[in-house]
Curated annotation (Swiss-Prot):
GO terms for molecular function: DNA binding; DNA polymerase binding; DNA polymerase processivity factor activity. Signal peptide: none annotated. Keywords: DNA replication, DNA-binding, Nucleus. GO terms for biological process: leading strand elongation; mismatch repair; positive regulation of DNA repair; positive regulation of DNA replication; translesion synthesis. This protein is an auxiliary protein of DNA polymerase delta and is involved in the control of eukaryotic DNA replication by increasing the polymerase's processibility during elongation of the leading strand. Residues 61-80 bind DNA. The keyword DNA-binding applies. It is found in: Nucleus. This is Proliferating cell nuclear antigen.
Length: 263
């Protein structure tokens, strides 16, 4: 049996809305310690990695490790039935068929609503993500990163990122013109959520598809902060922490010689 209860359905809504345009079918792995997901996008260019630890849930029970295959479009439809501040219970019993039950409860109205969603058989390939020692780790306000990607996509299909100890520079350059956004590390800020921090072992200069970066920034709703882990010639990691008990990470391979084909 698997049963997990979130205090706010809104959190699960935000997670699903962040990834449903990248990943169609989601193989959720549920264990005693966490509910997690790892999946490539349909073009096999980007990898999505989600982890929701037990501490994120009000109650959590998983008798044995199981895989729950769900269409994210169908999951989104189910979650649209919930108010953001409803509680959300996910329940699956192996002897009761191939469906998962979402129960939304509104304590203010003494109301509950059950939505049953059919599960799917999904071939989930666990991709080994090698441990990487990154040359640059940058943490910044998630809203700033989202705006930067959106602004630069007006000028270019590619996002160039360069970073040194002096700062991190985002550049979009195209036929109609260009835009450059520079962030220096914040030396003193009263609000930690607004700080830009940089750890630089070696300088980096890398190019990525800005279309994918704009997709990733849909996760801005989940977190005030975003972490970019960068190294020349290896995939970038764009990470959004989920409260203090989980994360949503996106991995994207760099573009080679500004070529659109990133496979």
């Amino acid at each position: 049996m698997f049963e997990a209860k979130l205090a706010n359905a809104g959190l699960l809504k935000k997670i699903v809305e962040s990834i449903k345009d990248l990943v169609t079918d989601a193989p959720f792995d549920c264990s005693e310690t966490a509910m997690s997901l790892q999946a490539m996008d349909s073009s096999h260019v980007a990898l999505v990695s989600l982890k929701l630890e037990v501490g994120l849930f009000d109650t959590y029970r998983c008798d044995r490790t199981i895989n729950l295959g769900l269409s994210l479009a169908n999951m989104s439809k189910a979650l649209k039935c919930a108010n953001n501040d409803d509680t959300c219970m996910l329940k699956y019993e192996e002897n009761e068929g191939d469906s998962i039950i979402f129960t939304f409860a509104d304590p203010k109205r003494d109301k509950t609503q059950d939505v049953t969603v059919k599960m799917m058989d999904i071939d989930s390939e666990h991709l080994g993500i090698p441990d990487q020692d990154y040359a640059v780790v940058c943490e910044m306000p998630a809203g700033e990163f989202q705006k930067t990607c959106k602004d630069l996509s007006t000028f270019s299909d590619s996002l160039n990122i360069t970073a040194t100890k002096a700062g991190i520079v985002f550049t979009g350059k195209g036929d109609i013109g260009s835009s450059v956004v520079t962030y220096s590390p914040s030396s003193n800020t009263d609000d930690e959520t607004e700080a830009v921090t940089l750890e630089v072992k070696d300088p980096v200069n890398v190019n990525f598809s800005i279309k994918y970066m704009n997709q990733f920034t849909k996760a801005t709703a989940l977190s005030d902060r975003v972490r970019l882990s960068l190294c020349n010639d290896v995939p970038v990691v764009v990470e959004y922490p989920i409260e203090e008990n989980g994360y949503l990470r996106f991995y994207l391979a760099p573009k080679i010689d500004d070529d659109e084909n990133m496979d």
